[in-house]
């Protein structure tokens, strides 16, 4: 952790050096050393780690620089000078733009995926609670429907056939409970009020 600060500073420094050198310089010389645990030449100091080496080398490659005389043996115990060849400015610009484009595409895909996941979890079915109708108006409507479609329904006592059932009552039709939707009111005679703000129509 103690080497993170110097490492970050050195990385930014060399990125600037490499980009500036790509403006027109054919080659840039960077001082590298050979780590004790690896034979890979790497820029750094006495506190340089293998991770620092790989990170700096990756930045060099992304910026379009390649090492000259890669197979030249390095001397141990001293800081060796290694030459890097800079690619033309257009190639550096092109590689940077392609990298940025890839990052933007990946970011956009991840953003769309996260938004879709959040919306799917937050989506709730819209429940509409119908307004509770006036029982007297409903009874009058059912009476008018019955008189219209069943004009010869019977005697005067049949007027009581259209009535409001108390909450909790059940109506049996042909030996079993018969419940239909309120939209089927034309074919019904009995209205059940369950007491929850909605009405259930039942055939008699």
Curated annotation (Swiss-Prot):
Example GO CC term: the record gives: membrane
| Residues that span the membrane, as ranges | 4-22, 90-106
Specify whether Metal-binding is a keyword of the entry: no
The protein's topology relative to the membrane is:
Multi-pass membrane protein
Which cysteine residues pair off into disulfide bonds?
none
Q: Where in the cell is it found?
A: Membrane
- The name this protein goes by in its record: Putative membrane protein ORF19
Which species is this record about?
Ictalurid herpesvirus 1 (strain Auburn) (IcHV-1)
Taxonomic lineage per UniProt?
A: Viruses, Duplodnaviria, Heunggongvirae, Peploviricota, Herviviricetes
């Amino acid at each position: 952790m103690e080497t993170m600060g110097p490492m970050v500073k050195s990385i930014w420094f060399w990125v600037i050096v490499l980009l500036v050198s790509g403006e027109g310089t054919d080659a840039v010389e960077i001082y590298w050393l050979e780590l004790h645990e690896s034979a890979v030449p790497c820029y750094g100091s006495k506190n340089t780690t293998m991770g620092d080496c790989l990170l700096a080398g990756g930045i060099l490659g992304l910026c379009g620089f390649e090492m000259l005389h890669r197979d030249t043996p390095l001397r141990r115990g001293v800081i060796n000078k290694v030459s890097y060849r800079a690619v033309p400015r257009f190639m550096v610009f092109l590689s940077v733009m392609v990298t940025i484009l890839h990052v933007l595409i990946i970011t956009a895909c991840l953003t769309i995926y996260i938004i879709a996941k959040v919306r799917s979890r937050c989506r709730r079915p819209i429940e509409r609670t119908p307004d509770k109708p006036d029982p007297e108006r409903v009874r009058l409507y059912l009476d008018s429907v019955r008189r219209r479609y069943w004009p010869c329904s019977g005697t005067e006592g049949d007027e009581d056939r259209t009535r409001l059932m108390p909450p909790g009552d059940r109506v049996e039709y042909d030996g079993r409970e018969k419940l239909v939707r309120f939209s089927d009111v034309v074919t019904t005679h009995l209205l059940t009020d369950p007491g929850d703000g909605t009405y259930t129509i039942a055939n008699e």
